[in-house]
Amino acid sequence: FQPIKESIVSRLFNAVAAEDLIVKGGREIVPGMIVTGMEVAEIDGAPR
């Protein structure tokens, strides 16, 4: 049995830490398309 590793989604339930994780999560998801802010939450499936 392997424990489930903590993911960004599980850490986002902490609203205090969530904003920093979302801000740091900005990235290029396909060539020429950069996501930032709450779009990162959408891409990662975050519960926000």
Swiss-Prot record:
EC number annotated for this UniProt entry: 2.4.2.60
GO molecular function: cysteine-dependent adenosine diphosphate thiazole synthase activity; metal ion binding
GO cellular component, one term: chloroplast
Cross-referenced InterPro entries: FAD/NAD-bd_sf
Pfam families documented for this protein: Thi4 (PF01946)
Annotated keywords: Chloroplast, Iron, Metal-binding, NAD, Plastid, Thiamine biosynthesis, Transferase
Enzyme class, spelled out: transferase
Catalytic activity: [ADP-thiazole synthase]-L-cysteine + glycine + NAD(+) = [ADP-thiazole synthase]-dehydroalanine + ADP-5-ethyl-4-methylthiazole-2-carboxylate + nicotinamide + 3 H2O + 2 H(+)
Coiled coil residues, start to end: none
Cofactor list: Fe cation
Stated role: Involved in biosynthesis of the thiamine precursor thiazole. Catalyzes the conversion of NAD and glycine to adenosine diphosphate 5-(2-hydroxyethyl)-4-methylthiazole-2-carboxylic acid (ADT), an adenylated thiazole intermediate. The reaction includes an iron-dependent sulfide transfer from a conserved cysteine residue of the protein to a thiazole intermediate. The enzyme can only undergo a single turnover, which suggests it is a suicide enzyme. May have additional roles in adaptation to various stress conditions and in DNA damage tolerance.
Family: Belongs to the THI4 family.
Assembly mode: Homooctamer.
Record protein name field: Thiamine thiazole synthase, chloroplastic
